[in-house]
């Protein structure tokens, strides 16, 4: 059984993934950071229930947004602070879907310092610039 980890009032609760809900994992590629973004180049959406992946190019972003609007749960990496705000800024996208942001999950489970320590201890061959949190600074 797959589980969904949710933080409510700083406490974690495990709940089963519901077969009755539509879970969409998505990512987008754009032309810049939030302050300077002017265009979304593409959006890829994976429907967990149907196990189908959909790719939307620059001429089909409206279709991708309509697809995202069908979700009960949206999942992605840094979607709270980047992807969803970019879609709102450029296309007036809003959602009432539950959000699972894997960047937030990662930081809750492994604080930056702990990630660095784990990388150093378990993977000493990993170059220092690739250790630690998944941030621009890391890369």
Which residue stretches match the model-derived regions?
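Conserved DEDDh/DEDDy metal-dependent 3′-5′ exonuclease domain
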Residues: 4, 13-16, 21-26, 34-35, ...
């Amino acid at each position: 059984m797959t589980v969904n980890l949710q933080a409510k009032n700083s406490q974690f609760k495990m709940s089963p993934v519901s077969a009755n809900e539509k879970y969409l994992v998505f990512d987008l590629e754009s032309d810049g950071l939030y302050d300077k973004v002017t265009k979304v180049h593409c959006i890829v959406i994976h429907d967990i229930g149907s196990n189908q992946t959909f790719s939307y190019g620059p001429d089909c972003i409206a279709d991708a947004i309509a697809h995202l609007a069908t979700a009960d749960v949206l999942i992605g990496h840094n979607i709270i602070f980047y992807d969803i705000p970019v879609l709102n800024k450029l296309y007036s996208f809003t959602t009432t879907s539950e959000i699972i942001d894997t960047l937030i999950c990662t930081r809750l489970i492994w604080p930056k310092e702990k990630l660095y320590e784990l990388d150093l201890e378990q993977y000493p061959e990993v170059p220092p610039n690739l250790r630690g949190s998944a941030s621009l600074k890391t890369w």
